[in-house]
Amino acid sequence: NTNIVDVYKTATQKTDISVDDLSSDYFNGNNYNTNLYPNAIDPAIFYDKDGGMWMAYGSWSGGIYLLELDPATGQAIHPTASAKDGNVITDIYFGKKIAGGYGQSGEGPYVIYDKDTGYYYLYMSYGYLTANQGYNIRMFRSENPDGPYVDAAGKEATWGSSGHNGIGVKVLGSYNLPCLAYKYMAPGHNSALIDDDKMFLV
C-alpha cells in the first residue's frame, strides 16, 4: 500500500504536505475525477528492452496509466513531478497516462516488446461487456515503453475526443461464421506472446 501524501512528500522533498496540497484535479466536486484518473484494476507488468520493469494499469473513463517499478522490490518508482502535455498527464501518484480516458471506454492493457521490430505494442479493450457493440481489441505501438503509443494512422492512444471509434488498429471483435455453432461475443482483456518465430494472441 502507498499513502498518497507520503508519495508527494518523497517526490517533492517537502515534509509539510497535507491532503489539502494535493492536485485539485483529483476531484470533481466531492467525487473522485474518473474522467482524468484511473481505476486501480487490470494491472499488466512488462519488461523493456533494457530490463526495466513497468506496470500498465487502469480502466475505463480515466484511462490507462503507466508506472515504472523497481525490479528488486516490485515497488512503484513514482514520477518526481506532475505535468500535462496535451492529453498526456504525468502524475506524481498515478504515473503517466498512455491511453484512453476523458470519459471513454478503454481497459485491460497489455504491453509487449518485439525485439525484431523494435516496438512496444499496447493492446486494449474498447467497448462494453455486452452483445451489442461489445468489447473489441485494439493495438497501438511505440518506440518507448512510456509512449507515445500510436496506431497505423499516427493517432495517439491518448486522443481525447468525444469517442474513440476512430483510433487504434482493430485486432478482434465480435464475429459469427456460418460454420460455427456459436457466435463469439465481446472478445477482450487479451495478452500476447512471442515464441521463437511465432506470435500468439491470448
Task: Enumerate the predicted regions with their spans.
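Carbohydrate-active catalytic/glycan-binding domains of CAZyme proteins
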Residues: 1-202
